[in-house]
């Protein structure tokens, strides 16, 4: 189990998880606010 937790804390695994979270966040923001360029404040 110690080796598995060490593997999960390596940079490629952490970076992959971060990219997936970022992509999902951008997709959801664009789903609810499709074109923020048309907002005139």
Curated annotation (Swiss-Prot):
Gene behind this protein: psaJ
Keywords noted in UniProt: Chloroplast, Membrane, Photosynthesis, Photosystem I, Plastid, Thylakoid, Transmembrane, Transmembrane helix
InterPro entries the record matches: PSI_PsaJ, PSI_PsaJ_sf
Protein name: Photosystem I reaction center subunit IX
GO cellular component, one term: chloroplast thylakoid membrane
HAMAP family: PSI_PsaJ
Single GO biological process annotation from the record: photosynthesis
Function recorded in the entry: May help in the organization of the PsaE and PsaF subunits.
Subcellular locations according to the entry: Plastid, Chloroplast thylakoid membrane
Mode of membrane association: Single-pass membrane protein
Main location: plastid
Signal peptide (from-to): none
Transmembrane segments: 7-27
Family membership noted in the UniProt record: Belongs to the PsaJ family.
């Amino acid at each position: 189990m110690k080796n598995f937790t060490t593997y999960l804390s390596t940079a490629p695994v952490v970076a992959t998880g971060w990219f997936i979270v970022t992509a999902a966040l951008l997709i959801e923001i664009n789903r609810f606010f499709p074109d923020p360029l048309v907002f005139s404040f």
